[in-house]
């Protein structure tokens, strides 16, 4: 049980980004050539085929190989240098391109800003109303650029407008009235359909 706890402590995710360099015996920021040279030496020294009697050699070889794989991939190396093994875990979960966003949104100031805006807007209720419903029964609605005038039309003016419109349309009177229909009237005629009103 005690061994399990120490293994868990060793496997905790760090943010320093130095453990992989220490496995290879290098300083943080070493060049790619130094990483390759050191990897070759350590891989030959700890290879399981050269050390069949030492069970720890296989584990050490896996650690060396993992460190080399991460430190030679520039994208993973940049993430590791900036955020440590926690950054690599986040990259594995959300993708390399989302690591910066994750750490930005999980920073103390982003969390604080989220809480403050939530409190000021009543659990974001006010933000939703402003965006969707113009808030507070329309009182916060943006003002229109044209001034609103009360538009009133008197019944006499409306009647005069209708007469004027009818005088303009005198050229096209309605001449065909609909035919009377009853229960026995056939609604669909037999034969070709005609949409003309001249018949």
UniProtKB/Swiss-Prot annotation:
Coiled-coil annotated residue ranges, if any: none
Topology of this chain in the membrane: Lipid-anchor
J domain sequence ranges: 19-84
GO cellular component: cytoplasm; membrane
Protein localization: Membrane
Modified residues (Phosphoserine): 14, 16
PTM entry text: Palmitoylated.
UniProt KW keywords: Chaperone, Lipoprotein, Membrane, Palmitate, Phosphoprotein
PANTHER family assigned: DNAJ HOMOLOG SUBFAMILY C MEMBER 5 HOMOLOG, DNAJ HOMOLOG SUBFAMILY C MEMBER 5B
Protein name, entry field: DnaJ homolog subfamily C member 5B
Species of provenance: Ailuropoda melanoleuca (Giant panda)
């Amino acid at each position: 049980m005690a061994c399990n706890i120490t293994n868990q402590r060793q496997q905790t995710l760090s943010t320093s980004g130095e453990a992989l360099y220490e496995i290879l015996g290098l300083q943080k920021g070493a060049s790619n050539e130094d990483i390759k040279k050191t990897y070759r030496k350590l891989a030959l020294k700890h290879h399981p085929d050269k050390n069949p009697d030492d069970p720890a050699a296989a584990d050490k070889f896996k650690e060396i190989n993992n460190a080399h794989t991460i430190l030679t991939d520039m994208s993973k190396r940049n993430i590791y240098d900036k955020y440590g093994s926690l950054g690599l875990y986040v990259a594995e979960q959300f993708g390399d391109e989302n690591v910066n966003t994750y750490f930005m949104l999980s920073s103390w100031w982003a969390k604080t800003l989220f809480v403050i805006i939530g409190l000021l807007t009543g659990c974001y209720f006010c933000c939703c109303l402003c965006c969707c419903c113009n808030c507070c029964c329309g009182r916060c609605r943006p003002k229109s650029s044209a001034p609103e005038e009360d538009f009133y039309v008197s019944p006499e003016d409306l009647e005069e407008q209708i007469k004027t419109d009818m005088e303009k349309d005198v050229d096209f009177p309605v001449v065909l009235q609909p035919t009377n229909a009853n229960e026995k009237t056939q609604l669909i005629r037999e034969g070709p359909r005609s949409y003309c009103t001249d018949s």
